[in-house]
Amino acid sequence: MGAALALLGDLVASVSEAAAATGFSVAEIAAGEAAAAIEVQIASLATVEGITSTSEAIAAIGLTPQTYAVIAGAPGAIAGFAALIQTVSGISSLAQVGYRFFSDWDHKVSTVGLYQQSGMALELFNPDEYYDILFPGVNTFVNNIQYLDPRHWGPSLFATISQALWHVIRDDIPSITSQELQRRTERFFRDSLARFLEETTWTIVNAPINFYNYIQQYYSDLSPIRPSMVRQVAEREGTRVHFGHTYSIDDADSIEEVTQRMDLRNQQSVHSGEFIEKTIAPGGANQRTAPQWMLPLLLGLYGTVTPALEAYEDGPNQKKRRVSRGSSQKAKGTRASAKTTNKRRSRSSRS
């Protein structure tokens, strides 16, 4: 590479001397324009004056053979020097890569450009609190030094406070305002819906539940005993039995007592289309009132459902009865003994 730089210095000096002697610029000599112009002049001298010798024509123009040789050979020399520089630089880069490769041949993962390129698959994991983990409190100290200049702590403190205030005005206040507006809108909607449910007139509609009431009545009227038992009692007593009644055979002497229905108390039924009467708060305080069946709904809209209301609405929690191990083992023992007795009886009957 040093020899190439030396040749470049000699070439630049020769081209500069030729440019000073002929009046052409270095760019024209390097591009070959000066050599083309001189050849045109030599051709014109050979045509007009009949000079056929190149040396005589060069002398007639006022150039020396050395200067003409430099001007004519400068473009080719520059092109060859460029190729030489490219070759030398390519060899040097290959040598550098080979040196790095063979010096780090034991590494299985290439680390070339790992720390310069952010899009690599492998990167060093350095979280923001990395140095604060190693040295607790260093981030706070660095931030204070960065934000407050000890030499000009007054202006820097004012600038820091103004920036923090501007950050709050620009970013925090709009978000807080939108959240508060959302809360107030939701609260207003719930309050309006609750007051609408309180002030509206409610009407009883039994049509959707008549079908379920009929099914409930049907299953409640079914006999709690098997029809075969009823037939046996009827055959014994000589009485005809109609199914679809509620029977009770506890301490029964005849089929009439078995087929006797239970007397149900007549309850006042509420008919469809009747309006629910509104009640006014006593004492003249004009407090808000609501029926008891609507209270869980209204409190749920306001988000104040108490455990007592949850138990009233969902019913008490029924816990499973635990069975002791002793009783279960006794039950298993009795079942096993019953099975063995049955087996013995069957064997004796076969024999």
UniProtKB/Swiss-Prot annotation:
GO terms for molecular function: channel activity; DNA binding; structural molecule activity. This is Minor capsid protein VP2. Residues 272-307 are annotated as: D1. Belongs to the polyomaviruses capsid protein VP2 family. It comes from the Viruses. One of its GO terms (cellular component) is host cell nucleus. The strain Dunlop sequence is shown. A lipid is attached at G2 (N-myristoyl glycine). Residues 341-351 have a biased composition (Basic residues). A motif (Nuclear localization signal) lies at residues 315-323. The keyword Lipoprotein applies.
